[in-house]
């Protein structure tokens, strides 16, 4: 398990918050001080809280859950899309559509539409339409891909949401809280930490700082996936052992039953022989007496 170090956080500027005039007083416990009108985040707390968040992601994925990565600001888009894909998770990197979670059944219809359009273009069936109609369908597909591409394979709601800048992604936060989905977020000094279940105090504007955390959380997902596979393999081995043991017990019981039956048959034969011998002896004695 490789955690991000405090040195890495310093090198990527995680400790730089917003201007002191643009702050949320609720973030006071996570602020070390101020320098040149900029709040400085207490990295000792960031390290501790980041590790707790990292472990939560590992635990969630290891248990078979999924994580939704959210970051639509320009600085976060590339890292969110790239790292979530690498980890085999879902993401929203462009625009959060209202109801993405709270109205998931309707969103799924749009996803189905996107999948149908992609199929039409891939198998060539779109060619039966006129050129103008094809252009219209292509624009529709591109638009849907832009907003839903990162969740088009998401068949059920995620078990955890990881957010860059919850102040900007306030709708995603509200939807997650309404559905009881845990929220984890890189939270700058202008955010409300009370809305976040797993807070990671840090710079949510610098590209390097964002990439550091997004990559770390993607690694945590991969780690959890590996643990999940190990658990499945162990469970499979245990099941196979139980089956083998049951078969052995069944075979042993069958052999014991066969031995008992054979023993009973032998005993019966011996009794029959004894009875036959007795009958012969009695017959011979009777003949001798008669003579």
From Swiss-Prot:
- Which branch of life, at top level? Bacteria
Provide the GO biological process annotations: translation
PROSITE patterns from the xrefs?
A: RIBOSOMAL_S2_1, RIBOSOMAL_S2_2
Q: Which Pfam families match?
A: Ribosomal_S2
MF terms (GO), sorted A to Z: structural constituent of ribosome
Keyword vocabulary terms for this entry:
Ribonucleoprotein, Ribosomal protein
Annotated signal sequence range: none
Spell out the CDD domains in the cross-references: RPS2
Gene Ontology CC annotation, any one: cytosolic small ribosomal subunit
- What family does this chain come from, according to its entry? Belongs to the universal ribosomal protein uS2 family.
Name assigned to this protein: Small ribosomal subunit protein uS2
Its ancestry begins with: Bacteria, Pseudomonadati, Thermodesulfobacteriota, Desulfovibrionia, Desulfovibrionales
């Amino acid at each position: 398990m490789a955690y991000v170090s405090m040195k890495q956080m310093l090198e990527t500027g995680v400790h730089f918050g917003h201007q002191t005039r643009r702050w949320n007083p609720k973030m006071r416990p996570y602020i070390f001080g101020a320098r040149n009108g900029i709040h400085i985040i207490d990295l000792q707390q960031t390290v501790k809280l980041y590790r707790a968040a990292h472990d939560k992601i590992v635990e969630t994925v290891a248990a078979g859950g999924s994580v939704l990565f959210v970051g639509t600001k320009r600085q976060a888009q590339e890292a969110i899309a790239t790292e979530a894909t690498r980890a085999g998770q879902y993401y929203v990197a462009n625009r959060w559509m209202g109801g993405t979670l709270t109205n998931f059944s309707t969103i799924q219809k749009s996803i189905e539409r996107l999948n149908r359009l992609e199929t039409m273009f891939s198998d060539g069936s779109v060619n039966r339409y006129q050129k103008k109609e094809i252009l219209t369908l292509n624009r529709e597909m591109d638009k849907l891909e832009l907003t839903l591409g990162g969740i088009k394979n998401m068949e059920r709601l995620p078990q955890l949401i990881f957010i860059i800048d919850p102040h900007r992604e306030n709708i995603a936060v509200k939807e997650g809280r309404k559905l009881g989905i845990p929220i984890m977020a890189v939270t700058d000094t202008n955010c409300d930490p009370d809305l976040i279940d797993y807070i990671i105090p840090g710079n949510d504007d610098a590209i390097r700082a964002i990439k550091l955390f997004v990559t770390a959380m993607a690694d945590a997902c991969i780690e959890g996936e590996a643990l999940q596979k190990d658990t499945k393999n162990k469970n499979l081995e245990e099941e196979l052992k139980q089956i083998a043991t049951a078969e052995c017990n069944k075979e042993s019981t069958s052999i014991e039953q066969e031995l008992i039956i054979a023993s009973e048959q032998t005993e019966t034969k011996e009794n029959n022989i004894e009875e036959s011998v007795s009958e012969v002896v009695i017959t011979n004695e009777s003949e001798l007496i008669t003579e």
